[in-house]
């Protein structure tokens, strides 16, 4: 089914993230450290680490930072012990919000996340309260103008789960969230001459809710507050906000 506002929504989320570029390196270093801790320091044997390094390089994260983050993850260098944590809640009009964190103090993090919700008119929920409204997927988005037929052929041959043409001309390719499966499809598309505008393993909303006016402005404040927290890695919502 075509997603009428999918491309605009993705661009909006990326725009929010780009506006906070001062935090990008910190988030990337945390993800590399945790990936190395969980799966080992060899990118060839650790797909999550490989993807994290690739993302770091795309953001011009210095090589020394990458190498030191890996060493902290494997214990070769002393470092902070981060844990993964996910929190769920509701924004304006009951829209769904999921917040993924890497933290060394869950007590602090849960208090900060709850405060960000409540201060701006949202509320934090219990585990699982909105998770069913999202699907864990590999998501590759091609900008408007790509050939749907060529994308479909390359993606499905490489094992993609679905290819979705959107009303705005962008094309969304969905894969398994398994990093190896995701990489295989991404590489096949690149080999076919396509350059993904977005390529990530993410939580994709099953349905979206458009907000406008004051509701959109209030929702933006909730998202900004959550994304400004040091422990927050990703914020997902099914809200669609105007540009």
From Swiss-Prot:
It comes from the Bacteria. GO terms for molecular function: DNA binding. It is found in: Cytoplasm. InterPro entries: Integrase-like_N, TACO1_YebC-like_2nd/3rd_dom, TACO1_YebC_N, Transcrip_reg_TACO1-like, Transcrip_reg_TACO1-like_dom3, YebC-like. Pfam families: TACO1_YebC_N, Transcrip_reg. GO terms for cellular component: cytosol. Belongs to the TACO1 family. This is Probable transcriptional regulatory protein Tbd_2215. The lineage of its organism: Bacteria, Pseudomonadati, Pseudomonadota, Betaproteobacteria, Nitrosomonadales.
């Amino acid at each position: 089914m075509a997603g009428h506002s999918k491309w605009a929504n993705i661009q909006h989320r990326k725009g929010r993230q780009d506006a906070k570029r001062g935090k990008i390196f910190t988030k990337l270093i945390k993800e590399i450290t945790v990936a190395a801790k969980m799966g080992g320091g060899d990118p060839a044997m650790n797909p999550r680490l490989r993807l994290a390094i690739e993302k770091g390089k795309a953001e011009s994260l210095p090589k020394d930072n990458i190498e030191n983050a890996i060493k902290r993850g494997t214990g070769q260098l002393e470092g902070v012990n981060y844990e993964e944590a996910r929190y769920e809640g509701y924004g304006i009009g009951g829209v769904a919000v999921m917040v993924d964190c890497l933290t060394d103090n869950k007590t602090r993090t849960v208090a900060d996340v709850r405060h960000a919700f409540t201060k701006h008119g949202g509320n934090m929920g219990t585990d699982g309260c909105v998770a069913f409204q999202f699907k864990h997927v590999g998501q590759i988005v091609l900008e408007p103008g790509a050939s749907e037929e060529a994308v479909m052929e390359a993606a499905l041959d490489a094992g993609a789960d679905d290819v979705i043409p959107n009303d705005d001309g962008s094309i969304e390719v969905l894969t398994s969230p398994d990093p190896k499966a995701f990489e295989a499809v991404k590489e096949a598309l690149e080999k076919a001459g396509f350059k993904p505008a977005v390529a990530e393993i993410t939580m994709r909303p099953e349905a979206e809710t458009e907000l406008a006016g004051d509701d959109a402005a209030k929702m933006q404040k909730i998202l900004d507050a959550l994304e400004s927290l040091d422990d927050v890695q990703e914020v997902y919502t099914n809200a669609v906000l105007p540009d």
